[in-house]
Amino acid sequence: MEWETVIGLEIHAQLATKSKIFSGAATAYGAEPNRQACAVDLGMPGVLPVLNKGAVRMATKFGLAIGAKIAPRSVFARKNYFYPDLPKGYQISQYELPIVEGGELWIELEDGERKRIGVTRAHLEEDAGKSLHEDFHGMTGVDLNRAGTPLLEIVSEPDLRSAAEAAAYMKKLHALVRYLEICDGNMQEGSFRCDANVSVRPKGEEKFGTRAELKNLNSFRFVERAINYEVERQIALIESGGTVVQETRLYDADKGETRSMRTKEEANDYRYFPDPDLLPVELDPTFIEEVRETLPELPDEKRARFVEEYGLSDYDAGVLTATRELAEFYESVVTESGGFAKRSANWVQGDFLGALNKAGLELADSPVTPEMLGRLVARIEDETISGRVAKEVFEAMWNGEGEPDQIIEAKGLKQVTDTGAIEAMIDEVLAANPKQVEQYKGGKDKLLGFFVGQVMKASRGKANPGQVNELLKEKLDS
């Protein structure tokens, strides 16, 4: 029997506010445990939550970016459950009336096709604390610094049909929240994490199978591996006569498998009811339009513009718009180079990103600025240096030896364009290789490349390759 996989993702994006969603406590990562949890976060008697307007603005910004409906009235509810890192005994979330409804994202598949993925809703809620299992002599510690941090939970439609599609959707969403500057997207710190609802059904059947929820997947690789394992597990279980149970499962990255955590709760298990301490959130059209005006150029729009304006391939444009920071870096290189977009793209994607990855650096920590790289591209274009020599200059720039023009001057790397000097080098090369000259004249045209290489070697890469080719042909064909 052929099986079809059905996947829906719930993405939790920590919003980049400086204070928590219902209190003035800081949200900075890495503080000593329990140093950033105030009385509101701890659910102490007599304290009242106050909604952070910045979180509302960020949620609205996200909704507008995906073409969703922004609810003029949304309501916070209490989601009741017990867990050690949930000090109040309930989580403030949104249930029946979320702030964002509908919307869509388009993902690129491996075969180059694009697919629309619907978004059901996105709602605001507070994060829970964190259980710590190491260094406690068999006990569990609880850090409540994270409790009350604003989250935007983004729920997709069950439109994803493979682990690869799920990873592509997650990457697209990750890029978008970073473009919008509403989430730093740091997956190692838990700022962007995912729960995956996975089920299988016979191909062609409309009814959904029983789903399992895979919790807290915090890397693109883990999402793909966990879903693939879970799909295989469910199919094997059904084909052996078993039944898939609706449950929550945890992915064990070391073993590459999922394991059962608990039976999956339904909404009524949480006994949602409107939070009596918080008024409904009412947004007027003026506020929504003000937020709309702050939207940056979005990734898909920027990618299309790079193809149209700079003449890049769709693939190159996709690489260069993967993050807002890289796209801005590239455009600065183009501007500084004098508008040489394609060569700038080649250098950014090739030598620059290669050096960055090799050094394990973030873009912001690069020793080569976009202005420096742009000036290097300009020196290639105006034939001050050859492409080969440019690699030597780039390496020196990366090692902190200065600006491209300083390095070119200090190392004597300017391209030789003097015809007399190049002819003298050609004469020396031809005199040193009489056998090859004879073979070339006998019809071995491919030896021209050999002679060009020898002249370039003699000039230490400084001779103008175009002139070398032209003058060699003149001498050899005469």
UniProtKB/Swiss-Prot annotation:
Biological process annotations from GO: glutaminyl-tRNAGln biosynthesis via transamidation; translation
Protein name (record): Aspartyl/glutamyl-tRNA(Asn/Gln) amidotransferase subunit B
Subunit: Heterotrimer of A, B and C subunits.
Cross-referenced SUPFAM superfamilies: GatB/YqeY motif, Glutamine synthetase/guanido kinase
UniProt EC number: 6.3.5.-
Annotated PANTHER family: GLUTAMYL-TRNA GLN AMIDOTRANSFERASE SUBUNIT B MITOCHONDRIAL AND PROKARYOTIC PET112-RELATED, GLUTAMYL-TRNA(GLN) AMIDOTRANSFERASE SUBUNIT B, MITOCHONDRIAL
NCBIfam families: gatB (TIGR00133), PRK05477.1-2 (NF004012), PRK05477.1-4 (NF004014), PRK05477.1-5 (NF004015)
Family: Belongs to the GatB/GatE family. GatB subfamily.
Native source organism of the sequence: Alkalilimnicola ehrlichii (strain ATCC BAA-1101 / DSM 17681 / MLHE-1)
Residues making up the signal peptide according to the UniProt record: none
SMART domains: GatB_Yqey
Purpose of the protein: Allows the formation of correctly charged Asn-tRNA(Asn) or Gln-tRNA(Gln) through the transamidation of misacylated Asp-tRNA(Asn) or Glu-tRNA(Gln) in organisms which lack either or both of asparaginyl-tRNA or glutaminyl-tRNA synthetases. The reaction takes place in the presence of glutamine and ATP through an activated phospho-Asp-tRNA(Asn) or phospho-Glu-tRNA(Gln).
GO MF annotations in UniProt: asparaginyl-tRNA synthase (glutamine-hydrolyzing) activity; ATP binding; glutaminyl-tRNA synthase (glutamine-hydrolyzing) activity
Catalytic activity: L-glutamyl-tRNA(Gln) + L-glutamine + ATP + H2O = L-glutaminyl-tRNA(Gln) + L-glutamate + ADP + phosphate + H(+); L-aspartyl-tRNA(Asn) + L-glutamine + ATP + H2O = L-asparaginyl-tRNA(Asn) + L-glutamate + ADP + phosphate + 2 H(+)
Keyword line: ATP-binding, Ligase, Nucleotide-binding, Protein biosynthesis
Entry-linked Pfam families: GatB_N, GatB_Yqey
